[in-house]
């Protein structure tokens, strides 16, 4: 089966399973997922499955990407903060819908690979940086939308809530542990947060700080 046929099959699966927003479907169609997975998994790029990308991280299942993007309720004037760049695929999808994407990754090698992909695909409205996602990006705040692509514990990080604009939406997996996570949509109001629990998921945990880098191999003397 050709890559084009695999992509069409995946888009049909997404439609059958609740991804109905034409802007989201168009963005997923535009972004070549095979660019964001290791070469070993190129033949699985358009399967509806999460795939390993190294450093204990995964590229999310396309259905999860589609549904989480859809519930953000996006339009082309928005600035979006993404926590957890990973392969860069989710940020790339967002970039085809909104004005600007800010994305934070704690693993330097993943960030460098993602930035290379953004440049290759000429996705110039994405700004990425290495950092602690739990602290957000205060100098660029407030954001109209925040998407967290890692399990955020029982409550959303306080710094991210502060950086969400009034009227803005945050979509984040929350739960006491990985076995009990749910995607939650939070809308910031003048008086606090309105919470809507959506569907169960399993994401890698949201961790503080920048990940330590593996030590360089010593040169042979």
From Swiss-Prot:
Q: What class of enzyme is it?
A: transferase
Q: Give the signal peptide, or none.
A: none
Principal cellular location given in the protein's record:
cytoplasm
Q: Where in the cell is it found?
A: Cytoplasm
Catalytic residue list: 60
> Could you confirm whether the keyword Methyltransferase appears in this record?
yes
Q: Which InterPro entries match?
A: PCMT (IPR000682), SAM-dependent_MTases_sf (IPR029063)
Sorted keywords for this record are: Cytoplasm, Methyltransferase, S-adenosyl-L-methionine, Transferase
Residue ranges of the TM segments: none
Cellular compartments per GO CC:
cytoplasm
Give its E.C. classification number: 2.1.1.77
UniProt-listed Pfam families: PCMT
Family assignment from sequence similarity: Belongs to the methyltransferase superfamily. L-isoaspartyl/D-aspartyl protein methyltransferase family.
- The protein here is known as Protein-L-isoaspartate O-methyltransferase
Organism of derivation? Rhodospirillum centenum (strain ATCC 51521 / SW)
Q: Gene name, please?
A: pcm
């Amino acid at each position: 089966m050709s890559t084009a046929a695999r992509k069409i099959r995946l888009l049909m699966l997404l439609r059958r399973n609740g991804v109905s927003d034409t802007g989201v479907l168009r963005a997923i169609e535009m972004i070549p997922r095979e660019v964001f997975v290791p070469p070993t998994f190129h033949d699985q790029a358009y399967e509806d499955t999460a795939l390993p990308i190294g450093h204990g991280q995964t590229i999310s299942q396309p259905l999860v990407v589609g549904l989480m993007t859809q519930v953000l309720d996006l339009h082309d004037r928005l600035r979006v903060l993404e926590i957890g760049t990973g392969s860069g695929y989710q940020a790339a999808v967002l970039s085809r819908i909104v004005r600007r994407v800010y994305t934070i990754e704690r693993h330097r090698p993943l960030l460098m690979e993602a930035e290379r992909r953004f440049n290759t695909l000429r996705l110039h409205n994405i700004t990425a940086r290495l950092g602690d996602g739990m602290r957000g990006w205060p100098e660029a705040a407030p954001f109209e939308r925040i998407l967290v692509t890692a399990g955020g514990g029982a409550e959303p990080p306080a710094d991210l809530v502060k950086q969400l604009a009034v009227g803005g939406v945050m979509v984040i997996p929350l739960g006491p542990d990985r076995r009990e996570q749910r995607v939650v949509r939070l809308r910031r109001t003048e008086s606090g947060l309105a919470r809507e629990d959506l569907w169960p998921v399993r994401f890698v945990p949201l961790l503080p700080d920048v990940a330590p880098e593996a030590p360089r191999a010593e040169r042979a003397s």
